Swiss-Prot record:
It comes from the Bacteria. The keyword Cytoplasm applies. This is Heme-containing CO-sensing transcriptional regulator RcoM 2. Residues 15-86 form the PAS domain. The N-terminal sensor (heme-containing) domain is covalently linked to the C-terminal, DNA-binding response domain. Residues 161-266 form the HTH LytTR-type domain. Binds 1 heme group per subunit. One-component, b-type heme-containing aerobic sensor and transcriptional regulator that responds to CO by activating the expression of the oxidation operon cox. GO terms for molecular function: DNA binding; metal ion binding; phosphorelay response regulator activity. The keyword Signal does not apply.
Length: 267
């Protein structure tokens, strides 16, 4: 058993190293920010991705984006998360050391970005920030099948989830995920043997998962139906036992019970 676990861990490490190498080959988006978080400059990658977001969500032409609060270029539901990232300091209180990257979904255009913010310091102290991001959309998603006659493009379908662990970004295969548990702006991703913390919200994930496989059974829980073990009824409530290491009992809301039973083929 130990040898198989060791082999699995080694394979996972190799995948992480391969992805890390790919990430290093990317041309990153770079945004210079003043001390108030307003845009001073973009590189071409950042302008290509964030420019359309500003035009479509704010009605601001690309040449008028300079001086704008960078938080306004992101979806409203992501703004508190990004604002926290921009204002964060190192746990030891150092204003220059920066927090780990976060994954963020940008709906206009439909992109997944890994964002890192680094504080910049000069002779007079902190003088602004540099926001660096990598567009990992093509490594983590694929186009959704579009119903005939649909006027609004469907969100891209996820097949991997980017997370940050041990000073590196790794990708979790969706097929290995047993369940997702939401907690505010963050989500715990649970596999058979591991737990990972993601900055993607359950709402972001739900839009981009196959609804025939992944079901939001509760406001705080999305489950992968192939990993469902047993439905347990307790008084007036129903729990779903999942095949993770703890055999976790996930609460099922009343509004989802009938749909869950139908998908599981339970009478």
């Amino acid at each position: 058993m130990k040898s198989s676990e060791s082999a699995a861990a080694t394979a996972s490490e190799r995948r992480a190293e391969t992805f890390q190498h790919k990430l290093e080959q990317f041309n990153p988006g770079i945004v210079w920010l003043d001390p108030q978080g307003h845009v001073s400059a973009f590189n071409d990658v950042a302008l290509h991705i964030l420019g359309p977001a500003g035009e479509q969500s704010l009605g601001v032409a690309q040449d008028h984006l300079f001086g704008i609060d960078v938080v306004q270029l992101h979806p409203e539901k992501s703004r508190d998360k990004l604002r926290f990232l921009l204002q964060s300091r190192d746990a030891g209180g150092c204003p220059v050391r920066s927090p780990p990257p976060v994954a963020m979904m940008i709906n206009i255009p439909d992109r997944i970005l890994m964002i890192k913010v680094s504080k910049m310091t000069g002779a007079a102290g902190t003088c602004g920030s540099c926001m660096i991001f990598y567009d990992v959309t093509d490594l983590t998603t694929e186009p959704s099948s579009q119903p005939a006659g649909a006027s609004v493009p469907a969100p891209r379908r996820l097949f991997k989830i980017p997370v940050y662990r041990k000073s590196r970004v790794i990708l979790i295969d969706l097929k290995d995920i047993v369940r997702f548990q939401g907690d505010g702006h963050y989500t715990t991703i649970v596999t058979k043997d591991e737990r990972y913390l993601s900055n993607l919200s359950l709402a972001d994930l739900e839009l981009r998962l196959d609804s025939s496989v992944y079901l939001r059974v509760h406001r705080s829980h999305i489950v992968s139906l192939p990993y469902a073990v047993e439905l347990v009824k307790l008084d007036e409530s129903v729990n779903l036992v999942m095949d993770d290491a703890e055999q976790t009992q996930v609460p099922v809301s009343r509004s989802r019970t009938a749909q869950l039973k139908e998908l599981l083929g339970v009478v």
